[in-house]
Amino acid sequence: MSHSVKVYDTCIGCTQCVRACPTDVLEMIPWDGCKAKQIASAPRTEDCVGCKRCESACPTDFLSVRVYLGAETTRSMGLAY
């Protein structure tokens, strides 16, 4: 099952998404584009289980972290009643 995790440049470097991820997909890396001087990165997307806890934890108005579920997951989600 393959999910993609995208971190946008609206990230404020708060680390909420990193702490929320149960499978350690995300980590913080140095970045000069925000006050915190760090941004979330997703180096281990193969470990993503698609729970979207990172999205829920993101405090920005435009979610800085988005999880795009793989085709198998979205297909099985359509079977629910």
UniProtKB/Swiss-Prot annotation:
<dbReference type="InterPro" id="IPR017491">
    <property type="entry name" value="PSI_PsaC"/>
</dbReference>
<feature type="binding site">
    <location>
        <position position="51"/>
    </location>
    <ligand>
        <name>[4Fe-4S] cluster 2</name>
    </ligand>
</feature>
<dbReference type="GO" id="GO:0055035">
    <property type="term" value="C:plastid thylakoid membrane"/>
</dbReference>
<feature type="binding site">
    <location>
        <position position="11"/>
    </location>
    <ligand>
        <name>[4Fe-4S] cluster 1</name>
    </ligand>
</feature>
<feature type="binding site">
    <location>
        <position position="48"/>
    </location>
    <ligand>
        <name>[4Fe-4S] cluster 2</name>
    </ligand>
</feature>
<dbReference type="Pfam" id="PF14697">
    <property type="entry name" value="Fer4_21"/>
</dbReference>
<dbReference type="GO" id="GO:0046872">
    <property type="term" value="F:metal ion binding"/>
</dbReference>
<feature type="binding site">
    <location>
        <position position="17"/>
    </location>
    <ligand>
        <name>[4Fe-4S] cluster 1</name>
    </ligand>
</feature>
<keyword id="KW-0004">4Fe-4S</keyword>
<keyword id="KW-0793">Thylakoid</keyword>
<keyword id="KW-0408">Iron</keyword>
<protein>
    <recommendedName>
        <fullName>Photosystem I iron-sulfur center</fullName>
        <ecNumber>1.97.1.12</ecNumber>
    </recommendedName>
</protein>
<keyword id="KW-0560">Oxidoreductase</keyword>
<keyword id="KW-0603">Photosystem I</keyword>
<dbReference type="GO" id="GO:0009534">
    <property type="term" value="C:chloroplast thylakoid"/>
</dbReference>
<keyword id="KW-0472">Membrane</keyword>
<feature type="domain" description="4Fe-4S ferredoxin-type 1">
    <location>
        <begin position="2"/>
        <end position="31"/>
    </location>
</feature>
<dbReference type="GO" id="GO:0051539">
    <property type="term" value="F:4 iron, 4 sulfur cluster binding"/>
</dbReference>
<comment type="function">
    <text>Apoprotein for the two 4Fe-4S centers FA and FB of photosystem I (PSI); essential for photochemical activity. FB is the terminal electron acceptor of PSI, donating electrons to ferredoxin. The C-terminus interacts with PsaA/B/D and helps assemble the protein into the PSI complex. Required for binding of PsaD and PsaE to PSI. PSI is a plastocyanin-ferredoxin oxidoreductase, converting photonic excitation into a charge separation, which transfers an electron from the donor P700 chlorophyll pair to the spectroscopically characterized acceptors A0, A1, FX, FA and FB in turn.</text>
</comment>
<feature type="binding site">
    <location>
        <position position="54"/>
    </location>
    <ligand>
        <name>[4Fe-4S] cluster 2</name>
    </ligand>
</feature>
<feature type="binding site">
    <location>
        <position position="14"/>
    </location>
    <ligand>
        <name>[4Fe-4S] cluster 1</name>
    </ligand>
</feature>
<dbReference type="GO" id="GO:0009055">
    <property type="term" value="F:electron transfer activity"/>
</dbReference>
<dbReference type="GO" id="GO:0009773">
    <property type="term" value="P:photosynthetic electron transport in photosystem I"/>
</dbReference>
<dbReference type="InterPro" id="IPR017900">
    <property type="entry name" value="4Fe4S_Fe_S_CS"/>
</dbReference>
<keyword id="KW-0479">Metal-binding</keyword>
<keyword id="KW-0602">Photosynthesis</keyword>
<dbReference type="GO" id="GO:0009522">
    <property type="term" value="C:photosystem I"/>
</dbReference>
<keyword id="KW-0813">Transport</keyword>
<dbReference type="GO" id="GO:0016491">
    <property type="term" value="F:oxidoreductase activity"/>
</dbReference>
<keyword id="KW-0677">Repeat</keyword>
<feature type="domain" description="4Fe-4S ferredoxin-type 2">
    <location>
        <begin position="39"/>
        <end position="68"/>
    </location>
</feature>
<keyword id="KW-0934">Plastid</keyword>
<dbReference type="InterPro" id="IPR050157">
    <property type="entry name" value="PSI_iron-sulfur_center"/>
</dbReference>
<feature type="binding site">
    <location>
        <position position="21"/>
    </location>
    <ligand>
        <name>[4Fe-4S] cluster 2</name>
    </ligand>
</feature>
<feature type="binding site">
    <location>
        <position position="58"/>
    </location>
    <ligand>
        <name>[4Fe-4S] cluster 1</name>
    </ligand>
</feature>
<dbReference type="InterPro" id="IPR017896">
    <property type="entry name" value="4Fe4S_Fe-S-bd"/>
</dbReference>
<keyword id="KW-0249">Electron transport</keyword>
<keyword id="KW-0411">Iron-sulfur</keyword>
<comment type="subunit">
    <text>The eukaryotic PSI reaction center is composed of at least 11 subunits.</text>
</comment>
